[in-house]
Amino acid sequence: VVLFISVNQILLFLLVLTICVILYNKVHKVPSTLNNETIDLESPEEMEEEIPVVICAAAGRMGAAVAAISSIYSNTDANVLFYIVGLKNTIPHIRKWIENSKLKEIKYKTVEFNPMILKGKIRPDASRPELLQPLNFVRYYLPLLIHKYEKVIYLDDDVIVQGDIQELSVGMQNTYMGYLDYRKQTIRDLGISPSTCSFNPGVIVANMTEWKHQRITKQLEKWMQRNVEENLYSSTLGGGVAISPMLIVFHGKYSTINPLWHVRHLGWSPDARYSEHFLQEAKLLHWNGRYKPWDYPSVHNDLWENWFIPDPSGKFKMIRPNS
């Protein structure tokens, strides 16, 4: 009997010990898991999604790209990677500008655009030669320049971003009348009403999967070639030959955004157009048109100068009345 009691006591002791061990593990498991999660969040594998932003850096107006990048970087905590696209002779300049200014902290890659890809696809037009610059066509070739992203943000260099770039979505509103030459039968045959709302392709969030699936670049090149043959888009119309093919190809394939994310036409006239209060509330300002904020005359250039970083090499200078 004594032996029997001793065995039961031992078994009871082991049972109690097992329960204690289980309870101990349960109590201490939660903080252990939290610690692991904290480490994982800080590890490269679990970092927040990277936001690719494409901006062109053109000779003669490189300060525009710098100001745009500065405004984006200063107004977000997002993980932004800038793809700065330029021609071979401009890339060393923009690199030096970034590395010798407060922008040296940004994440960026420089991408060389080869203008030979446009050979035979652009019709010469002397009325607005600046619209024929090769970098105006970079947006046609986004999947060839940037490979690994589902979405890519493309911005013209004459913008200032006052909001958080994470909020940016897609869509604009203009009308097609100002871009396509409706005197041409080929344009009329498209069935696009002149009063149909269009978008401004200076601010784009592009779905790269659909772009590749629908062979958008090939479609754009087709309409470039048609213009060489038929002169469908005059440079005297808004945007010239770079914008018009995009309006045709993307007709009905885009969505709208909050108007504060694209306050445009600031470069259409040297006279003030918007109230200061409205401009302060705007998320993105766009000086599309002839009157650029680094030039003179221009409007609301103080909002642009807030983000401009002087060129360490002294090559780029703003033009002001007293300069």
Could you tell me what each predicted segment is?
Residues V1-S323:
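Glycosyltransferase catalytic domains, chiefly GT-A lineage
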